[in-house]
Amino acid sequence: MTATEEPNRCRIVLIAPRIDDPAKLKSLISAAAEGGDVASLILPAYGDGETAFQHRAETLVPVAQAHGIAVMIEDDTRIAGRVGADGIHFEGRKNGLEELIEKFQGRMMIGTGGAKNRDDALELGEARPDYMFFGRFGYDNTPSPHPRNLSLGGWWAEMIELPCIVMAGNEIASVEAVAATGAEFVALSSAIFAEGEDPAAQIAAANVLLHAKAARFEAGE
């Protein structure tokens, strides 16, 4: 998802944490970006109103993009356009996803998530989004990834050409389980941004594990 020196193995996608202080959030994202390779950053709305969500996005998008990190805004196309984000993360039904892709294809990346089973995932995949996300924002509250997410990610990576992102757990070591599924991306949030953690050190540690343990993708994968 970035333009420079992309590793040919499972890469990190950051999920911005639920923090109301924009200055603190900016500091955390900036520190994480300094820690090493990060493909993209997804900004969930977390139920914020439009004004608060846009302010958060305006604060974070330039920071991430300055480090070559693509930024995806959850669901709100107007905010994504106003802040110059790279794409939109959509969680909803297939027809809504199709409309979004038709409107913004070629101008913004469109990713999706919310699938709870294979049928859900296949239906959304028919719209040909840029990626499929398996997990739920804010639910990486156990050391290991959710077994359902691992199962869906492994099946998807084996059967479907579209890239997928699988939510990791709240410990850095959980990136190994995600990488073992063959998923192109591992999503991290609590493992990076939990109180008392050093985001830069956590990103660096995750990349060390991925470099050592993740399989290399063949050209074109």
Task: Show the residue positions of the predicted features.
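Short capping loops/turns at secondary-structure boundaries
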Residues: 114-117, 146-149, 168
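Conserved N-terminal beta1-alpha1 strand-loop-helix module at the mouth
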Residues: 1-89, 94, 103-130, 161-162, ...
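Flexible, gly/pro- and Lys/Arg-enriched active-site loops
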Residues: 92-98, 136-159
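Internal alpha/beta core interface subdomains
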Residues: 183-185
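Glycine-rich anion-binding loop/nest that anchors nucleotide
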Residues: 133, 164-170, 187
